[in-house]
Structure formats: C-alpha cells, structure tokens
Regions:
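Bacterial Sec-dependent N-terminal signal peptides
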Residues: 1-28
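Acidic, His- and aromatic-enriched active-site or binding-groove loops in soluble protein domains
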Residues: 185-205
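Glycine-rich oxoanion-binding loops at beta->alpha junctions
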Residues: 101-130, 142
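Glycine-rich, aromatic-lined ligand/substrate-binding cores of catalytic
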Residues: 232-242, 247-324
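Conserved functional hotspot residues or short segments at active or partner-binding sites
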Residues: 291-398
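Glycine-rich, charge-decorated loop segments at or immediately adjacent to ligand/cofactor-binding or catalytic sites
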Residues: 92-97, 166-188
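Short internal beta-strands
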Residues: 81-88, 168
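Glycine/threonine-rich flexible loop motifs
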Residues: 139-151
Length: 420
C-alpha cells in the first residue's frame, strides 16, 4: 500500500520571510546583497537531517557562505553517505558534455555517483540505505542547461522509492524574463525535457513544483505524488518533497553567482548571454569556447576580417572545440554586467543569429549540427525560419501562442514576487 506522503513548501512566518518587492529595473549593475539562499538557512532544515543517512546532489556551486555544503553538513555532524554529481562533475571541472565516472572524493572520502556518465538517474540500489535526499545546485534558468533535467530525474527517483527529498532553493540569475520557443515534445532530450521556453523565469524550486503540479514526471512518480497531503512538516512528521525558500528574493532581484558556475560560464555576463548565444553551438560558428569569454565571443574564420577577432585555443573548459588556433571574426557581446543586460534587453536576442546567417558565405554549412540546433531550439521551425529570411519580429510572433500558455502555467507555481 502506498503510504501517505507530504509535499510542502516552507512558508511559515517563523521559518521564512516572504520575498520583498523591488521597485528597481531589472537593468541594474549592482547585485541585491541581502538575498539569503535556501542553503544558507541551515537553522531551518538542519532538524530534518540530524541522525539521518544522507545522499546529496551537489557540485561546486553548493556553498553555504564561503564553505561548501558538504563540509558544512559534516562539521555539523550530518552523516553524508553518498554524493551525486551532475554534468561537469561534483567539483565542476569537467568539460560540457564530458562523461564523468563514479569515484571517491579525495577531500572527504565520500563516494561520488555520477549522474552524467553511464546513467542520468540514481538506481533504487543507490538510495536504498538512505533516509533522506538533498538537492542543492545553482541553476542558470535556461532550458538547455542540464541541471533541471538532473533535478527531474532525482525527484522522480525520490518519489518512486518513497524517499523524502529536501530541495534548497537558489535564485535564478535569469529569472527577470520569460522568452523563447516552447519545446515541442518531439524534440525532447536531456537538454530539454519539458514544454517550457528557452528562458523560463523560475527558480529550480519553483520548476520542481511545476513538475509535480503539472504531472510532468514518470507515471510511477506522478501516481505516488497523487497521494500527497499539504501540511506542516516536523522532524517526526514525514514529508516527501520540501522546498526551503530563499529570503529577500524576487524575480526582479539581481543575483551575482558567488562561485563560477561551470568552466564555460565563468562570469555573470556569460550567464546573461547564454540563453541567446548557446544556440550557436548548433552552427559552424565558435561560441567562444577556448577563450576567456565563452558565450560572449561569437565568430568564424570566414566572416569579414573587419569584425572583432579572437582565436580559440584549448583550455580548462574546452579541451576540444571549434576552430582551435584559427582567427575567428565576429562579435564581442561582452562588457560590464549592466552593459550586457542592456544588450539582452529581457529577451532571447535573435539578431546576432540572423545576421550571422545573412553574412555567412557558405549557407549550406551554417547549421553544421542541425540535430543539435533543433534540440537546443526545441523544434525544427526556427532553423527553417532563419533559412527563409524571416525577420525577428515574425519569428517572435510565431512563439507567442505557446509562450502565453506557458506563462499562465508558470504563474501557478511562483514562490516569489514576479518581475511584472
């Protein structure tokens, strides 16, 4: 018999302070310094971990202040039995797409199970001896960044095996707008598992609530979730899914990531541009991998030589990529955070992609990886529209019906004041 389970978002006044409204424009150079992440609220969630055997999904972004979450919990006497690692690995030093194996972490001696290697989802055997699962990873709010897919697989595993999951919410640095084509289910992959736009404007906690509420999980996980009761959890009252909210955060808030997010998202400017410039991964153009400004430099050796020039070379974040050792010509989209925000202007910017195709001399080879481009776009329509010379306005208009539908769904699951 399925036991009664509890899905709960921590909202009690004694535990949480509701997000405060901000009157500032989303285009501002300074970060909101008073934001407290879910992970930082140790006093709220420690009670649920004491005396338990823990499995934690974490990477280098899992910090409490200046200390890694794993170190924080171990110092507090929490028994971490296993660490699960996402794309780029637990320590965040693997290339994009690089398969990572299982190993024992040298610093802590704790086994690390990779969920971006031979498998993407924990097995029942991986978690059978655990009392509770914890998820604490900083996301960037973009559909094709794989951490939301990893979170979904982790959540499904928890539900399917009746293990409580504690999710420590973190701000989304790209949550100040919602834009892009909504994914066509025919193009479902690990870089896009659900019918959401490229930039969906939700924290990972809100996104998880949407997965639950819209029944977008596996059949078994959805069936288990149907038995939930919303109530106030205590150490003696089991919950099945618990979100620890951020404090002093809204979807207008500016949040500068305290830790480099991945080898190819080394600074906030790259994070802001990523929803737009990652589409270039499916083209013949370099997206700046192998430079100090990945996703800020865009170019190709055959573009006009009076354009911005850069030369990709192997580095920590890109051991192999496009056009190594060749001078590429194109765009430097970087600048200060405020300047980049003005360039992004709260939407997916298609103008660089459209212009690049227009001036590219060998049109037939522009979309060098068509299947990859379609997976990133979430459809096969965008490529056709660009080839047909459609304007940005025409393309954006084609997104609107599905985008409007998604915005209504999104609103149901927001835990923080919205940007509009």
């Amino acid at each position: 018999m399925i036991k009664t389970l509890i899905i709960f978002v921590l909202l009690l006044d004694s535990f949480a302070v509701e997000a405060q409204s901000s009157n500032s424009s989303f285009i501002q150079p300074s970060a909101d310094q008073n934001i407290i992440t879910g992970a930082d609220r140790v006093d709220v969630y420690l009670r649920y971990l004491k005396g338990k055997k823990i499995g934690i999904f974490a990477n280098q972004t899992s910090v409490v202040g200046n200390t890694h979450m794993v170190d924080t919990l171990r110092k507090l006497g929490i028994n971490i039995k296993v660490i699960f690692g996402p794309e780029h690995g637990f320590r965040g030093n693997a290339d994009a797409g690089e398969k990572v194996g299982n190993y024992t972490d040298e610093k802590t001696g704790i086994p690390v199970i990779s969920l971006y290697g031979q498998k993407r989802k924990p097995s029942p055997e991986d978690i059978q001896d655990l009392d509770i699962l914890v998820f604490d990873i900083q996301d960037v709010g973009t559909r094709f960044y794989t951490y939301i897919s990893s979170m979904q697989e982790f959540l499904e595993t928890a539900l399917e095996n009746h293990k409580p999951l504690l999710l420590l919410d973190r701000p989304n640095p790209n949550s100040f707008y919602v834009d892009g084509p909504v994914l066509d289910p025919k193009f479902r992959s690990f870089v896009g598992m659900q019918p959401v736009p490229i930039n969906y404007g939700m924290t990972i906690g809100e996104y998880a609530m949407m997965l639950l509420g819209e029944k977008w999980l596996s059949e078994k996980a959805n069936a288990v979730n149907a038995y939930n009761i919303t109530t106030n959890p205590t150490p003696d009252t089991p919950f099945h899914f618990l979100v620890i909210k951020c404090k002093n955060y809204t979807h207008k808030s500016k949040y500068i990531l305290p830790v480099r997010h991945s080898p190819n998202l080394p600074e906030i400017q790259a994070v802001y541009l990523y929803p737009t410039t990652c589409l270039f991964e499916g083209t013949a153009l370099s997206e700046g991998r192998g430079t100090t400004k990945p996703f800020e430099y865009i170019g190709h050796p055959s573009l006009p030589k009076n354009m911005f020039a850069f030369t990709p070379n192997p580095n920590e974040g890109a051991k192999s990529s496009k056009h190594y050792g060749k001078i590429c010509y194109g765009w430097n989209l970087g600048g200060t955070p405020a300047e980049v925000l003005r360039k992004v202007d709260g939407k997916i910017q298609l103008k660089w992609l459209i212009e690049a195709y227009a001036i590219f001399p060998a049109k037939d080879s522009f979309f060098a990886r068509p299947e990859a481009f379609n997976r990133l776009a979430g459809n096969d329509v965008l490529m056709k529209q660009i080839k047909e010379g459609k304007s940005e306005e025409e393309i954006r208009k084609s997104w609107e019906p599905k985008l409007s539908e998604f915005k209504l769904i999104r609103k149901k699951y927001l835990l923080y004041d919205d940007f509009e």
